[in-house]
Design a protein with these regions (language model features):
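An acidic, low-aromatic, low-complexity terminal/linker signal
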Residues: 1-175
Length: 175
């Protein structure tokens, strides 16, 4: 029989806290053949694809900006941010407008996704910690993995999806 150490107990409590903190409502969406989710409280609006004005000398995943009722909102393509193959935009492609914390306060940011699925109310028991993928991969933007109807949905911390440099670039675009 395997003996548990104090360290094992600490890790178990941390995992339990992470799972309980992850419980709540998530907007789920598709990228390629995968399903992702972000906390509903971070979502401000879901809109159909509209014209995006490109901004020169930005990384490829920063598509540009949109005019949202007189407010300039930066837009990123999550496919490109995650290193997935680029795809043509379709009728289902949409922009999820989220609110993230920028250098000088809250910032609206649009994310282009292949399509929105549904809002799920997830219990802590439906969420598992992110697996350990090894040293090469930090996965700091993953909240966990939700098990729903025999499928896995990847839960994202939208605040951490963008790197510090991305947030700096977005803040510069808005000045």
């Amino acid at each position: 029989m395997e003996r548990l150490t104090d360290e094992d107990g600490v890790h178990a409590r941390v995992r339990q806290r992470n799972v309980l903190c992850g419980a709540g409502k998530y907007l789920t969406f598709q990228l390629s053949n995968e399903e992702f989710g972000i906390r509903v409280l971070k979502v401000r609006e879901i809109m159909g694809l509209q014209e995006i004005t490109a901004v020169p000398q930005t990384p490829a995943h920063i598509k540009g900006v949109i005019n949202l009722r007189g407010k300039v909102v930066p837009v990123i393509d999550l496919r490109l941010k995650f290193g997935l193959a680029a795809a043509d935009y379709t009728q289902r492609t949409c922009i999820i407008v989220t609110q993230v914390q920028g250098e000088s306060g809250p910032v609206l940011m649009g994310i282009v996704v292949d399509g929105v699925s549904e809002v799920l109310n997830l219990a802590g028991s439906e969420i598992e910690d992110t697996p350990d993928f090894g040293e090469e991969y930090s996965g700091g933007y993953l909240l966990g993995m939700a098990k729903v109807k025999g499928k896995v949905k990847i839960l994202l911390d939208i605040e951490r999806v963008l790197s510090t440099q991305d947030l700096h670039n977005l803040n510069s675009m808005l000045r």
